[in-house]
């Protein structure tokens, strides 16, 4: 039986007149900015336009962005705050080897455009020459490992992460990577828009070869090699939809089995170069793509192999070299693929670089200055209330059997919650920041991160480690540790407002909390037990009922025409759509329960319920370029914000 969910926004239709008479002081208390609304729209017909139309009109996309929304604006504010912290350090001398010296010096190196342009492509010249002078196929495998340590990834990647069948322990794992355009569809699909991007990529590769000194003939030859290698890889790669099956991505092999299954691949040289020579087993994520990589490595003529690896170096280093390289890199990856019109100013790129290479060092400074203890305390209460409400929803699910409910509630009760920042900060004492070149420092930063990662191989998982920096405007659920994490960076307006009442905060950050919790029970998360192991805890009947309900959501998002002739991918975005839908419902239930004893007043003509839904929709206010719509349809597991707010509020769906 289909049950129609129309969450209670109908009252908007009766009160649109009152919505335009708020006072500024009341707006701050309510958390709703009336300038963000479009009161000419009917909320019962187009709630997204009503809630976000004013904001979209007043916030056109800046030239340096492919899309511009709440996440972007908050990230911009954070970046300005971080800029102030970093520039203060960069303005003075510090003890050599101190965090202050590393942060300040790296920023100055990235900002020094005079030196970058004077050096040109010299920082990668020796590496280019080495790759162009390969004498023996055996040396390629060691080179692949050395390059990965420096952040240059070709063919395949090895990493250390939780063993999904034994989540308390770390294991070495392989994963398909290496396509320069990111998604296999750009190599395989032949519609006009995709073909146009592919042709632009060919021109880009040729131009980049020439910028580092190749003549036209050699550059054109390089283009053909890159397209041949990456098209062959793309044909063997799993799609993003196929990658959503965690069981298919788990194929543990002993070193002996690896050598048997991929006999031409020099595993000893590769693992040794990655500082993993003692590893005796690897979890292979996608055996077919690894097989394709092994075949190409074994058969591609050595000269062509060198050309391809030179391209991977050029592609990885481009943004750290002179203006000509950085601008050409931007022209394809941002302007062509996403529609971005201008490169970000250098200071923004410098802040992003420092915040990435020395993430927790920057994060520690950030939270000390900008994250109040009261914000963490209020978040703890919100999380607790949403956890209780999700538990109540699970207990009341008519379609789920008792035995599955018991397991679901056990999993919910064991959520590991992280808020704001880690209790222990990373130690960057062994990372060297020197004044040689931007690229050399990025290589050392990547080598430092690699060493930190491989040191975990075969050791217990540290459940207190954070997978995001505190300054990040995002949140996550990690199934292998059964944790939800909300960095300090996202705990600000419009997601969280210490000056707004619960109606606003449950509608904004409350939905984000509910979203991450629901991930523990989406199409992927539900396959992991309370301990983070890939283990089926559902009865066959309950799993079937879940799949039936999930298919309804797939069908809804498949039917959305996001651009003329281009439709959403309901299967690829299923996990995020389930989390968005569940997060909204859980947050609303928690909000009603939290305010039942002391109902909130009407503010500015808005009921508490209306403020809740306006806060929710306001989070998704976003302007986006047509090119980025097409790009995200191929690459992003998240649906566009417009459809999230419209569908999850008003779309009929099976009871979840």
Predicted segments with their positions:
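Structural recognition of the beta-strand scaffold that forms the well-ordered cores
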Residues: 46-49, 173, 483-485, 520
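Bacterial N-terminal signal peptides that target proteins for export
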Residues: 1-7
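Short, Gly/Pro- and small/polar-rich lid/capping loops
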Residues: 23-35
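C-terminal motif of bacterial Sec signal peptides marking the signal peptidase cleavage site
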Residues: 17-18
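Noncatalytic, helix-rich "gating/capping" subdomain that lines the substrate-entry/channel surface
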Residues: 89-381, 385
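Active-site-surrounding "flap" and adjacent substrate/cofactor-binding loops of secreted or lumenal enzymes
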Residues: 42-45, 50-110
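Intrinsically disordered, low-complexity linker/terminal regions across diverse proteins
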Residues: 226, 261-264, 283, 287, ...
């Amino acid at each position: 039986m289909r049950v129609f969910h129309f969450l209670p926004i109908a009252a908007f239709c009766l009160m649109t007149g009152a919505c335009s008479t708020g006072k500024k002081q009341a707006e701050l208390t309510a958390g709703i900015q009336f300038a963000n609304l479009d009161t000419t729209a009917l909320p019962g017909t187009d709630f997204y336009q009503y809630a976000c139309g004013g904001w979209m009109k007043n916030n056109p996309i800046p030239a340096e962005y492919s899309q511009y929304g709440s996440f972007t604006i908050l990230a911009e504010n954070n970046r300005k705050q971080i800029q102030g912290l970093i520039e203060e350090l960069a303005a003075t001398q510090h003890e050599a080897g101190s965090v202050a010296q590393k942060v300040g010096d790296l920023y100055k190196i990235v900002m020094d455009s005079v030196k970058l342009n004077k050096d040109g492509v010299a920082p990668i010249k020796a590496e280019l020459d080495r790759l162009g002078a390969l004498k023996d196929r055996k040396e390629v495998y060691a080179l692949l490992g050395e390059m990965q340590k420096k952040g240059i990834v070709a063919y395949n990647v090895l990493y250390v992460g939780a063993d999904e069948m034994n989540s308390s322990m770390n294991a070495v794992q392989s994963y398909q990577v290496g396509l320069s355009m990111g998604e296999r569809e750009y190599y395989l699909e032949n519609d006009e828009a995709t073909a146009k991007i592919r042709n632009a990529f060919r021109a880009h590769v040729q131009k980049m070869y020439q910028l580092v000194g190749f003549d036209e003939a050699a550059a054109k030859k390089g283009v053909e090699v890159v397209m041949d290698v990456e098209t062959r890889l793309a044909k063997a790669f799993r799609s993003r939809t196929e990658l959503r099956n965690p069981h298919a991505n788990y194929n543990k092999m002993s070193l002996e089995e690896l050598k048997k299954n991929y006999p031409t691949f020099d595993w000893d040289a590769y693992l040794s170069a990655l500082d993993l020579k003692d590893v005796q087993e690897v979890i292979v994520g996608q055996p077919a793509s690894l097989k394709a990589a092994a075949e190409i490595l074994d058969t591609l003529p050595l000269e062509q192999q060198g050309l391809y690896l030179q391209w991977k170096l050029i592609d990885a280093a481009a943004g750290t070299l002179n203006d000509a390289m950085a601008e050409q890199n931007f022209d394809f990856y941002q302007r062509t693929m996403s529609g971005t019109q201008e490169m970000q100013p250098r200071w923004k790129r410098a802040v992003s670089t420092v915040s990435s290479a020395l993430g927790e060092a920057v994060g520690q400074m950030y939270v000390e200055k900008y994250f109040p203890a009261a914000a963490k305390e209020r978040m703890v209460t919100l999380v607790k209330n949403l956890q209780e409400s999700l538990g109540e929803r699970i207990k009341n699910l008519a379609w789920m059997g008792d035995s599955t409910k018991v397991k679901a509630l056990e999993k919910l009760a064991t959520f590991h919650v992280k808020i704001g920042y880690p209790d222990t900060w990373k130690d960057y004492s062994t990372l060297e920041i020197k004044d040689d070149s931007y690229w050399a420092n990025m290589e050392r930063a990547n080598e430092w991160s690699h060493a930190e990662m491989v040191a975990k191989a075969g050791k217990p998982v540290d459940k207190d480690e954070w997978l995001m920096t505190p300054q990040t405007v995002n949140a996550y659920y990690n199934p292998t540790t059964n944790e939800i994490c909300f960095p300090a960076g996202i705990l600000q307006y419009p997601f969280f407002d210490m000056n707004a009442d619960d109606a606003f905060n449950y509608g904004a950050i409350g939905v984000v909390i509910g979203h991450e919790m629901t991930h523990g029970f989406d199409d992927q998360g539900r396959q992991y037990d309370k301990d983070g192991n890939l283990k089926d805890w559902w009865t066959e009947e309950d799993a079937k009922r879940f799949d039936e309900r999930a298919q309804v959501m797939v069908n809804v998002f498949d039917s959305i025409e996001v651009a003329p002739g281009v439709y959403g991918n309901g299967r690829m975005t299923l996990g995020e759509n389930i989390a968005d839908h569940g997060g909204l419902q859980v947050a609303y239930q928690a909000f009603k329960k939290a305010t039942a004893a002391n109902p909130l007043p009407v503010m500015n003509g808005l009921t508490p319920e209306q403020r809740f839904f306006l806060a929710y929709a306001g989070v998704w206010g976003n302007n986006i370029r047509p090119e980025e719509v097409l790009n995200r349809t191929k690459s992003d597991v998240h649906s566009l914000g417009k459809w999230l707010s419209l569908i999850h509020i008003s779309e009929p769906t099976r009871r979840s």
